[in-house]
Amino acid sequence: MGINPTTSGPEVSSREKKNLGHIVQIIGPVLDVAFPPGKMPNIYNALVVKGRDTVGQQINVTCEVQQLLGNNRVRAVAMSATDGLMRGMEVIDTGTPLSVPVGGATLGRIFNVLGEPIDNLGPVDTRTTSPIHRSAPTFIQLDTKLSIFETGIKVVDLLAPYRRGGKIGLFGGAGVGKTVLIMELINNIAKAHGGVSVFGGVGERTREGNDLYMEMKESGVINEQNIAESKVALVYGQMNEPPGARMRVGLTALTMAEYFRDVNEQDVLLFIDNIFRFVQAGSEVSALLGRMPSAVGYQPTLSTEMGSLQERITSTKEGSITSIQAVYVPADDLTDPAPATTFAHLDATTVLSRGLAAKGIYPAVDPLDSTSTMLQPRIVGEEHYETAQRVKQTLQRYKELQDIIAILGLDELSEEDRLTVARARKIERFLSQPFFVAEVFTGSAGKYVGLVETIRGFNLILSGELDSLPEQAFYLVGNIDEATAKATNLEMESNLKK
């Protein structure tokens, strides 16, 4: 589906007579607005409330029409705080949906849901805007080629490889490293692939948004000296913002990514942190819009809302959007409707494990729970597929033996099982990796490991060639040569102590 960008911003349309209404009811972030008969705005039109509150402060609130109620009334959701709004205030129908700036001028800048820059670097130098509501590309426009997207992260590339132009979910509870993994992916992809990224911060912590921005400036993903050379545009609708903003900020980020794909014909990376907050924001306004809650209190339109966002994230013959979405899993319950609905749209899942994080193995990606539709011999090749399967079998056998080890001890195992356990523990540690973005608090230099090197390393462990090396030599290293060098250093240190 080609974008039809306009050359006017999201201002009020300049008709001879503006379509004016007035507020009749305010319930938190939801407004009811009455319009003259025959002048009702369309669904998804942007409405603007301008005026002054009781203490004389200027008010400028943008809302989006969600429902036509009858009796010449509409129900709209506000994109910013409704503090100071009063019944009777004048409301202007802009006549168009929310439109945001798109194109090269968005790179290196931070925007809110309305496409307004919020980084104090002045106005955005673009007259090209695009509406945030569009239909997904048609079947005939889709690209069906299958190819791997190398990330440089061993556990991901080997066991749950990402598809170029696919959708990937990062699953995990609070504090197991989703955002750090996303930052590492942005860093690696900008450096290794030279691609353009769009980051949508949906309902996450403001502090994390600030940290990410600073990290990007440090790593050169955002170029402070020459903003136009930057590789990422940032769109934030953080936790402190009303649900309307959090519900639509994902669409704002996606609209910017679609322009790079359809008009600039580029391969784009779209990061959404966190897709669960998109669902959560929808559920917050759903009851206020008068909808009956569904399972676990979620909105009845959950699947429709998720589908309208996800189906626009795809590859066309012009370019591709590869999307990596962090998915917060409430109470670590993968059957919760929010993560369960997200699963249906994904090509690969990267599941983060609290158990691995507790062991200090980072990235804490669960090698047995993480999946990918790309892990097939005809796509990745026989060697990659066989290596991945043998790694999974070894780790699965180790998992089965853990109860026996806990009760009877390692000595009660057969010789073959003891060897399996030793190799599995080395594999588990070799799946860890020092990150560029975590250098500050690990003290280890970050490592990017190519897929060929990754496969070679795991084949050497599985073949038994490295059985004599201590397992700590495999912890937080890049390729297998670093592990053997670390083993030599450990041996020298122990000899010196003697």
UniProtKB/Swiss-Prot annotation:
PANTHER family: ATP SYNTHASE, ATP SYNTHASE SUBUNIT BETA, MITOCHONDRIAL. It comes from the Eukaryota. This is ATP synthase subunit beta, chloroplastic. The gene is atpB. It catalyses: ATP + H2O + 4 H(+)(in) = ADP + phosphate + 5 H(+)(out). It comes from Phaseolus vulgaris (Kidney bean). GO terms for molecular function: ATP binding; ATP hydrolysis activity; proton-transporting ATP synthase activity, rotational mechanism. Pfam families: ATP-synt_ab, ATP-synt_ab_N, ATP-synt_VA_C. Gene3D superfamilies: 2.40.10.170, Bovine Mitochondrial F1-atpase, Atp Synthase Beta Chain, Chain D, domain 3 (1.10.1140.10), P-loop containing nucleotide triphosphate hydrolases (3.40.50.300). Produces ATP from ADP in the presence of a proton gradient across the membrane. The catalytic sites are hosted primarily by the beta subunits. GO terms for cellular component: chloroplast thylakoid membrane; mitochondrion; proton-transporting ATP synthase complex.
